[in-house]
Amino acid sequence: MTTDSVAAPAHRVLGAGKGCLLIAGGGTGGHVFPALAVAREWLGREPQGARSVVIVGTERGMEAKLVPQAGLPLETIRVAGLKGMGGTKLLKNLAMLPAGFWDSEKIMRRHTFSAAFGVGGYAAGPMILAARLHRVPSVIFEPNVEPGFTNRVLAGISTRVACGFQETATRFGSKAIATGIPVRAEFFAAPRGEHREPFRILITGGSRGALPINRAVIDSLNLLAPRKNQLFIVHQTGERDYNAVRVAYARREFRAEVVPFIENMAERFAQADLIVCRSGAITVAEVAAAGRAAIFIPFGAATDAHQTRNAEAMQNAGAARLLPQTELTPERLTREIFSLLDQPRRITEMEDCARKLARPDAVEDIVNMIEGLVRQ
């Protein structure tokens, strides 16, 4: 936590080479990882100590662990989600709003912020509103094709909007720019695939795994078995399903590496000929950066169907195939895999299309937007 200090009015805008950046939001990795990338870029543009950053989130989101691990200051506010809630849960979360706004106001009084950057999630709403009331210019970041609830609300009061996709920027109008999504440099370093046997498939449902994907793959193994000598599968299962999935591969004598969690995902992307995965904004951006062919299986319950819209954008660009979870059967999954296994040229075409969507300068462009507001 940052110590209290009131050195200047909270709305005073400093020069672009100085000042403290407020980064607000969090909850999931899709919120936190862009926040960390922007924080590092903001701090790294000036000598050490010339700039500072304060990240504001909640005690329950991934930011509570990831931000301190990154060595960055985290402050928290009392706030919870409203969209999709009902009954007593909605009433409880509504009752928390005054506390969240009060916490936000106290943070604004403690610091002299040059600008604010909202990454979506519960904490972004109260903090970006507080920034507006204190006349601190703000940029909000929307990585998905379909904007989230918080960002749809905040777009009207923010100064600028940075978007992961051009069609989203068009939707927000003149204040928006398509910057792309910040992705670690390791993903861009992936070499072009050679697609020689064994055909390497990476399967992942995210760090916690995805039961529907794990179950569909297990049920597909008998159908894949006639060509198992052509395949090598790396499968990230999550902790819950690890043993069941590992045993399923072993019983059928597949060449496979089954792990509960993958530490260096960029390295695994680089080794894969095909990736079977969810289609959250960060994952989609990583697939594009690595230039890999993918079969996207969107999380069906994702808010506003944003994963489906992300996957549709990639499929429409020729960079991926979309397999809706409602259509995820062993037969369909096997058919999609064999179709690409038999068409290495098609995989190469998908890879080329994916690379065209990658935005290696995304984090630089976002910080340029922020600095532009500070200079005004």
Indicate where each model-derived feature is located.
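Active-site-proximal region of nucleotide-activated glycan assembly enzymes
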Residues: 62, 132-192
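Glycosyltransferases and closely related glycan-assembly transferases
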Residues: 103-117, 123-139, 152-156
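Acidic donor-binding loop of glycosyltransferase active sites
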Residues: 113-115, 270-285, 292-293
